[in-house]
Each structure stands twice: as C-alpha cells, then as structure tokens.
C-alpha cells in the first residue's frame, strides 16, 4: 500500500491567536489544510504578548528578534511545497531564496497595510511582496485595485466568519432592546459618527447601547451605555445580546480598504446591521434585505428608528443576513476558494 506523503506548508503570520487578522485570515484554516493532506508549520512574526510588565519590557523585544530569525531559518532551510504569508513583509533576500528553491508563496493581506504615515516605506514593502508573490489574496475590491497597479491579478476572498460558532441566540423575553457595536480601542473613535443620532433616539425610545472592545475611557452621555472588553471566548455571547449591529466608518483611503468583518459577524448571529456606505460595506449590506446604509445623522436616525419600531423587520433582515453569511462568507466557503488557488500553484 502506497503511503501518501503530506505536503509541507509554511504559514507565516502577523501574530498569534491574539491577533485578529492572523486568527481570521490564516490560523483558523490550519485544521482544514491538515484534513486536505498538508502538514502545516506555523511561525508568527511575534510571540504572544505577555501580560507581565517586566516580561513585556525586557523579554518581549528579545523574543521578537528570535521570531524574526525563526522565519529566516524556516525559509532558508525548511522543506516546503508552499509558503503562505499573511500580512507580514519578508526581505528581498528571502523572496529570492524562495524563488531559487522553486517554492511558491501566497501573499494574503486584508487592510491598507501600505498606508502608514509612521512607516512610509511600507508602501514599497507591500508592492515588493505583491510583485513577486506567485499569488496574492486580498479581502476587498479596493485592495484588488492596488495590486493591479503592480501587475498582479489577485483573488478576492473576504475574511471568513465562523458561522458554526457565531449563531443566532435566544433573546430573553424581557430583555431591553440592545443596539450594539463591536470593535477595538482604536476603532472606537468612529463611534463619534453615531453619538448624536443615538442620543436623539434615547430621548424618544428605551434601549441600551452595548459596546464591546472600545477604549476603557469611552463614554457617551444621555444613553444607557454598557461597555464590555473584547474577549474571544465571550464573542458569541456578546453579539447574541444585540438586536441591531452598527458599523460606522469615516470615508478615508484607509477605511475604504476595511474588510467588513464586523458586519459578517452580525449577519452570522442573525441580527440586522446599519453601516456607513464606505468600502466593502456597500457590497455586504443590501439595504432592506439584510440591513441598511446610513451616511449622515438623519439617515442613521431614520434607519435605527425603523428597526427599533419593527420587530418583524429585525427578524426578517437578520434571517436573510444569516443565510448570506453561510452561503457566501462562511469559513468553509472561503477555504474552498483558497484551497483551489493553492492547488493550482
């Protein structure tokens, strides 16, 4: 009986499971790759960030250097059939090494990593990765256009949502209607865009505003506001408490490249969403079918008022969104697209 040799895959990521992009765009695919006969070796750019202050100040910088060296060793001496690089940059020397060894590499990124005022050379680093990758995968049409300018025709795969983990939940009968937002300390600055409509609604309707992952010092006056830290294990429970999910975004070069993952999570949980008409939001949100788009204060007010007053509409839009999340954006659907790309290399 012939024993089938496993295909060696080196997976280089921007971080560990505590890094959202690495977890969503790469790490959650590892079991799927292994089921398809790949032996996956994961090397992150940085180690898990320690909570201890001394370790963070003294040992973490040393470990970061060691992990960079591990990437160098893996590329130069490892035996691989494919290298999957998520978001990070590798040197021209290492790119040439892969080419000389006839090892194809896939480059995946999901944000405008080339726009960083503090690191202006990121644009050239990103362009270099795009030019020499055997295949580039991006999350939005806007990132696709960036790659085309460097002669690369990428594939678009949205950030996959775990529809088996993030599911509709049974709401408590007497639970107060909850308008929710989930994000990060950095993106909580975008909440300024919806504060006035929410405050105006609070003068007329009874609801609570749940923020998950916002800055610890974020406050909004005149509203029943509940703030929770983002914890992966609590993600489904927190989203499940929401009746309406929000994604406000300013219209900038950087936000137009965002992947809309928050919307996909709301949809997976079966709740309607209201979002700014920026970037991929305009593709994901189908007004009147799975949510609404709102560009100005009055539109935010009107869309939210409509959803507050119409329970059946919330159920309908949420159900439609759940169906689309499973059919178009689930981890299984996205992995099938990714696998076909890799198998052709």
Q: What label would you give each PLM region?
A:
Residues 2-7, 164-178, 316, 344:
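Nucleotide-sugar donor-binding and catalytic loop/hinge architecture
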Residues 14-18, 23, 83-102, 191:
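An aromatic- and histidine-rich active-site surface loop
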Residues 17-32, 36, 163-165, 172-241:
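Conserved catalytic-core segment of nucleotide-activated headgroup transferases in glycan assembly
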Residues 69-78, 92-101, 107, 111-136:
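Membrane-proximal helix-turn-helix segments that form the acceptor-binding/catalytic region
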Residues 113-114, 131-167:
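Donor nucleotide-sugar binding/catalytic pocket of nucleotide-sugar-dependent glycosyltransferases
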Residues 189, 226, 233, 237-268, ...:
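Nucleotide-sugar-dependent
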Residues 287-298, 306-312:
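Conserved acidic donor-binding segment of nucleotide-sugar-dependent glycosyltransferases
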Residues 306, 313-328, 334-340:
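A short, well-ordered alpha-helix in the C-terminal region of glycosyltransferases
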């Amino acid at each position: 009986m012939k024993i089938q040799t496993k295909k060696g895959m080196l997976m280089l990521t921007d971080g560990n499971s505590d890094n959202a992009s690495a977890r969503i765009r790469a790490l959650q695919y590892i079991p799927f790759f292994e089921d398809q006969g790949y032996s996956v070796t994961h090397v992150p750019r940085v180690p898990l960030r320690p909570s201890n202050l001394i370790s963070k100040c003294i040992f973490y910088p040393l470990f970061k250097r060691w992990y960079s060296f591990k990437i160098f060793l893996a590329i130069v001496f490892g035996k691989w059939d494919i290298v999957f690089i998520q978001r990070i940059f590798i040197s021209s020397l290492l790119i040439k090494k892969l080419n000389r060894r006839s090892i194809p590499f896939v480059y995946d990124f999901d944000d405008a990593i080339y726009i960083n005022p503090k690191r202006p050379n990121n644009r050239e680093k990103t362009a270099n990765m795009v030019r020499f990758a055997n295949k580039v995968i991006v999350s939005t049409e806007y990132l696709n256009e960036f790659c085309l300018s460097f002669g690369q025709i990428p594939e678009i795969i949205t950030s996959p949502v775990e529809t088996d983990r993030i599911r509709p939940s049974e709401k408590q009968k007497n639970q107060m209607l909850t308008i929710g937002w989930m994000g990060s300390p950095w993106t909580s600055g975008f909440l300024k865009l919806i504060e006035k409509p929410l405050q105006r609604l609070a003068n007329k309707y009874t609801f609570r505003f749940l923020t998950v992952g916002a800055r610890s010092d974020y406050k909004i006056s005149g509203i029943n506001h509940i703030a929770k830290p983002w914890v992966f294990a609590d993600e489904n429970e927190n989203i499940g408490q929401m009746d309406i999910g929000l994604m406000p975004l300013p219209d900038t070069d950087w936000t137009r490249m965002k992947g809309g993952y928050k919307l996909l999570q709301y949809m997976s949980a079966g709740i309607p969403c209201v979002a700014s008409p920026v970037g991929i939001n305009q593709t994901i949100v189908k007004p009147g079918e799975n949510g609404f788009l709102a560009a100005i204060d009055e539109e935010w007010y009107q869309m939210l008022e409509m959803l507050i007053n119409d329970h059946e509409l919330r159920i309908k839009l949420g159900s439609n969104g759940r169906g689309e999340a499973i059919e178009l954006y689930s981890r299984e659907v996205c992995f099938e697209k990714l696998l076909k790309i890799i198998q052709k290399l």
